Amino acid sequence: MGDIMSIKIKDIIVHVIKSELDIPFAFSQGWVKKRSATLVEIKTDEGFIGWGEAFCQGLEPPEISAAVIETALKPLLLNESPLDIEVLWHKMYNATRDFGRKGSVISGISAVDIALWDILGKFLNQPIHQLLGGAFRKKIKPYATGFYRIKGQGEAKRLAEEALSHFENKFDHMKVKLGFGLQDDIKCMEAIYDVLENKNVTLMIDTNHAYGRSEAFTLGEALKDYNLRWYEEPVTPEDIQGYTELRSKLNIPIAGGENEHTLYGFRTLFEAKAVDIAQPDIGSCGGISGVRHIINLAQSFGVEVNPHVWGSAVAQAASIQVIASIPTTHHSIYARSPILEYDQSSHPFRRELLENPLELDNGMVNVSSKPGLGIEINVDTVNKYKCNY
C-alpha cells in the first residue's frame, strides 16, 4: 500500500481504439461497421495504474468522449489524489455542467471514474465489489445479446439458428434485437420461440427506440404470451410519458435507461413511473460512482437495476463488479437477481484486450476477487488497435 496522504495523479492517457468489421451488422438505428472503444489510463506517482472505459454507442465516434477527457477533465485532475473519488466526480460534473450533463461528456466522466475505482482497489488490495460494500452474489448469470441483422429484414430462419447456438453455449437468457418493422419482428420472434420451446430459455426484446407509442404497444401485445423478462427501449428516450403509458397498458416489464445519465436523469424516469427495470450503462451514467447514486435512488422507488453493457472488456469487468454489489429490489427467498449483458456480436479486440479474458463457468460468470477491476490489460492489443497517436 502506498502513502494515502501523498499519492497523486501523474498522467491521464486516452486510447482511442477501433477495428473495422469484416461483416457489418445492423440494429434498428443503423449499420455497425466498426467496433470502437475509448479507454482511459490513469497513472499515479506511486506506480498504481487504473483503467476505465467510456461507453461508445454503435454509431458514436469514440473521439468525442476522448476529446472531453483530454481537454475538459484531465486539467482538473492532474496532481489530485485519485482516492478522492466522490470529490473528483463532483468536481468534474460541476465543471462541465453548463455544457455537459448528458451524452459524451458524462461518458468521459464515467471512464475516469472507473479508472479511479480501479486504482483505489489496487491501492487497498481489494476488489471493487468489496469497496462497494461486498458481494450479494459471487456468480452472475449472463444473457446473450445478439440477433443483429446482416441483411436487414427476412432473417427469421438465421436468427432461430443463432438462438440454438446460444443455447448450446449454455445461455438460458437471450435478448433479441428488434425494430425492423412489426411484421418482421413478430416473424423473427415466432421462429426463435419455436426452436427454443421446452428448453427453459427466458427471452427479452430490445427495439432500440425504433417505434412510436402505437407501434410499440402493438408489438408488446403481439408478444404478451412469450413471458418476456423485459421490453427494452420501446420508445425514444425523450418520450418519458410514452414509457409511462406503455408500462400501464402492457403486462411486460418495461426497461430503459442506457441513454439516460446520472441520478438526475434517472430521478425523472422514476418519478414518472416510467420503468420497471433501470438500465444505466456504467460507461455513460457517471461511472461506478454514478451507478452507486442511481442504485440507491432506484431502491427508494422500488425499481430494479440491471446495468446495460455493450463495451469492451474494461466495461464488462466494471459491470461485473457492480452487479455483484447490487441488492435485490424486491427481497424474497426466490428474489430475481440482476444479470450480465454478454454481447455476442462481432468484436475483434474485446477478448484480446485482456491477459485473462472473460470465460463462462458452466453457464455463469465468476466475480473476480482480484484487486480493482480484477483484470490485466494487454497493452500490445491497445497499441495494435490504437488510432490517436
Model feature map: region roles:
Residues 4-46, 51-58, 346-351:
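Structured beta-strand/loop patches that form or line metal/cofactor-binding pockets in enzymes
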Residues 9, 40, 47, 73, ...:
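Conserved, mostly hydrophobic/aromatic
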Residues 54, 144-146, 176-178, 205-209, ...:
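A cross-domain feature marking catalytic cores of carbohydrate-active enzymes
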Residues 221, 227, 238-255, 260-364:
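Shared catalytic-loop signature of beta/alpha-barrel
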Residues 369-389:
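Extended hydrophobic packing segments that form well-structured cores
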